[in-house]
C-alpha cells in the first residue's frame, strides 16, 4: 500500500511489554473515554478526536500509563491532536475539561458538588498548564515527532463507494460506530488503517445480515485472518469494558493499589 495509507504501528515486542504492566489496558480504555468526551465538550472535529485517540494509544503502548499521569497524557494528546488537525482548542479549556472529567470519574457525588473551572491565573491552572506542556514534549519525543495519522473512517467510505454500498445508510452508520470504538482500542496500533476499515465493514455487514462479495477485502490488501482477529478483539472490548470501568474506579479511589 502507499505510504499515505499507513502510519506507525506497534511491534509485537512493544505489545508484549505493554501487557506486562498491571492495569495498562484498563487505563488506556479510560483515557480514550476521556478523550472522546473532551472532544464533545471542546467541540473538536471527529477527525481531530480520532487523531488524539491514536496518538494517545501509540504513546501509551510505548510507555504504559500510571494513574497519576493519565490526565496529563490525555491533555497532551488532545493538545497535539488539535494542533495537528488545526482545530481550535485553548490550553486553558483543555486543562479544565480534563480536570473536570477526572474529578467526575473519581467522585460519585460530583454532580451534586459541582465543578468550578480554574481561572487562567490560578495556581491550579498554572500547575495544569505546566504538566500539559511537559507531557506534550515527552509524548512528541517518544513518537520521534511523528504525528502522521491516517483516519480509517475515510478509507471505509472509499471502500464502501468502491463496493457500491455507500447508499446503505445503516451499513455506513454501523461501520462508522465500529471504527469509533476501534480507535479506543489497541486495534489502531495493531493493524494498518486499511485493514481496520475492512474489519469494521465486515462486522457491520454481519450485524445487519448483509452478504458481501467473496474475498472483497483482498482488493484492499486485507486478509480473512486479519478480519477475524479484528472482530475478536473488538467483541472482547465490548464484553470487558464495563468490568474495566469498575476496576478503574477502585484504582482511582485507592481501594486497589496501582
From Swiss-Prot:
GO MF term list: cyclin-dependent protein serine/threonine kinase regulator activity
GO cellular component: cyclin-dependent protein kinase holoenzyme complex; cytoplasm; nucleus
SUPFAM superfamilies: Cyclin-like
Annotated Cyclin N-terminal domain residues: 16-148
Subcellular location: Cytoplasm; Nucleus
Family according to the record: Belongs to the cyclin family. Cyclin L subfamily.
Name the record gives this protein: Uncharacterized cyclin-L1-like protein C1296.05c
